[in-house]
């Protein structure tokens, strides 16, 4: 049984012209001199490509050719721009009425709801989407929203859910994302109706999910190619979808939310005022907030790395970041980070790992991943690794796991590799 992830909704009509891309082509039978010629067609020295017999026809013909060529080029550029303007990849500033209607005046069943956002699943312009309603951290006008959308919607990665566009009304923004069929990672690890069951019951599915998330976050931080480095600011197991397909993969939800809601603006760096401390409480999620984020409320790449470290420990242990147990009539907080630190320091990683994996995993790789998670959770943000390095490290451990799985392939799936007591 699948249980799905969280989201929000709203609109304004206006399509944004994307950046122009080049189209180039050449015929296979062209000589090298012809290819050099084609590169200089629009050069001020255009006469260099004309043969001696053509040159004899005079400069008037050459000028006529250049003028016609220029007109043709302008016409082609205009046609391409019009075509691109209609492509589905374009970000949309939806009209608020569209979202209001699609969500049945916001009376439709909520897809999910948290203290900071509400989400609906609906159909807009024939597309199955999730609309997320969030409050702005600061006022933003339509022009600025369009400019930010234009940048974010040009990002594409298999480990990110696609942002289609947005709308705004009052102090709220409504973000429209593609709907992805699957379940959030938290529910995959701990099914609310059956905590002893997990769809991620084998080692390769776990490390695949970890690799997908790491690569997606690395893309957000370092590889969008848009001359801007983004911060996610909402990394947690409930914001990651495990797709329902032949192979289990992970997609990070909410990319662009922090940027579009003004959560990453430097102008929002808090003082010692009371309002800033309230922002930390509302915008952060307990168990995923780095120490510096808890004290300042300012999101950074390093606070994202910290949150990823928590998610990695969840994947390995199957446990929640924070939970409470009763002890002598009092509630005692149990921290996954503290339990992991004890296990790593005492050499007890195998006892700490999720029992539902039945010890069928490469212990050395599991310990390396646990230590990597703790590196991401260093209290000093400067000592935390960059996501590019983390993603590369997990990719190598994934390959090691593949080799281990191939060697152990002849064993039954419920065979326990280690016979030693936990």
Protein language model regions, located:
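Activation segment/activation loop of eukaryotic-type protein kinase catalytic domains
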Residues: 236-287
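Protein kinase catalytic-loop region centered on the HRD/HxD motif
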Residues: 216-230
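Conserved catalytic-loop aspartate of Hanks-type protein kinases
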Residues: 304
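Structural motif in protein kinase domains
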Residues: 180-196, 320, 348
